[in-house]
Every structure is written in C-alpha cells, then in structure tokens.
C-alpha cells in the first residue's frame, strides 16, 4: 500500500482489528521511508446484479432512498432507516456470496420493513412485487395480518 504522505510504494502493518461488526478490517500502518503512520479500512466488495445483468456495488444509501420513498408521510426517522439498511446489508452478506441478485436485496428489505411500518411495507411490496390490482393488495394485507397474529402468539 502506498504511503499517503510520501507515496512510498510499501508500508508495514502494525496492528489489525475487525470493525463494523466484523464487516471490515482496520489496519494501522507505518511507512518505512518517512516513518509516518496511517490507517486503512478494508471491506469486501459486495456486488448487486441487476436484472439487466449489470453489476454495481451494494449501497446502503440506495436501500435507504428506496425505503424512504415508501415511508413518505410516515413517522419513520433516519435512525430507523439506517438500522434497516444495516440489517439488509448484514442479511445479504450472510449469504456468503460476493454477488447477489437485486431481487434478493428486495427480499431482504421486506422483512425488516414489515416490522418497522406496515403501511411503508405495503407501499414497497406493491412496487417490488408489481401489484396490478386491488386483489393483490388484499392478499398482501391478509398475509400481513396472519404474520401479525403469528407474532402476537409466539
């Protein structure tokens, strides 16, 4: 790794620690040329494969913006959205694959969103699952009620 101060092409790792709940490694480094120290953070790249076949890096911000639209006018704060995005990222990373279909990202959003806000869940699910009629909404509402009843009894 190049030193950010003198651009020397090598550095020595002094210390390594896991960070971000094991999703990244923080390394403290020293430059043998100028002697200055610096920190690097390494994360494994998680790629999302779109329907078109194009891949792009996973983005928590993209998850948040999509869910924020579904939550418009609802009492959902930024902390809750950030937590949901973290849960989604943890879920897709737990699959263990460096690439994940965008469909699976949508699935990973549905569960935490259902727990966060049922109206936002219905809005998101209607777009994600391409609802085309009131019957689609009615079926989803029934499934939501059944899930709520199961959760209440367990």
UniProtKB/Swiss-Prot annotation:
This protein's cofactor list reads: Zn(2+)
- Which keywords, in A-to-Z order, does the entry hold? ATP-binding, DNA-binding, Metal-binding, Nucleotide-binding, Repressor, Transcription, Transcription regulation, Zinc, Zinc-finger
Q: Where is the ATP-cone domain?
A: 46-136
GO BP annotations of the record are: negative regulation of DNA-templated transcription
Q: Where are the zinc fingers (unnamed)?
A: 3-34
User: What Pfam families does the annotation carry?
Assistant: ATP-cone, Zn_ribbon_NrdR
GO MF assignments: ATP binding; double-stranded DNA binding; zinc ion binding
Q: Superkingdom, according to UniProt?
A: Bacteria
- Cite a GO CC annotation: cytosol
The yes or no answer to whether the keyword rRNA-binding is present is: no
Q: How does the cofactor attach, per the note?
A: Binds 1 zinc ion.
Please give the InterPro entries that the UniProt record associates with this protein: ATP-cone_dom, NrdR-like_N, RNR_NrdR-like
Q: What's its job?
A: Negatively regulates transcription of bacterial ribonucleotide reductase nrd genes and operons by binding to NrdR-boxes.
Record's family? Belongs to the NrdR family.
**Subunit architecture:** Co-immunoprecipitates with DarG in the presence and absence of darT.
Protein name per Swiss-Prot or TrEMBL: Transcriptional repressor NrdR
Gene symbol of the encoding locus = nrdR
């Amino acid at each position: 790794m190049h030193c950010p101060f003198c651009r020397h092409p090598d550095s020595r790792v002094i210390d390594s620690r896991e960070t971000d709940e094991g999703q990244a490694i923080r390394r403290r480094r020293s430059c043998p040329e100028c002697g200055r120290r610096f920190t690097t953070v390494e994360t494994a790249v998680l790629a999302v494969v779109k329907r078109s076949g194009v891949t792009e890096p996973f983005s928590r911000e993209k998850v948040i913006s999509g869910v924020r639209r579904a939550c418009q006018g609802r009492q959902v704060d930024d902390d809750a959205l950030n937590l949901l995005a973290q849960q989604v990222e943890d879920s897709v990373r737990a699959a263990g694959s460096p690439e994940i279909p965008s469909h699976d990202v949508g699935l990973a959003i549905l569960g935490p969103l259902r727990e966060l806000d049922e109206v936002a869940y219905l809005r998101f699910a209607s777009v994600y699952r391409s609802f085309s009629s009131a019957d689609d909404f009615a079926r989803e509402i029934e499934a939501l009620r059944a899930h709520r009843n199961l959760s209440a009894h367990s």
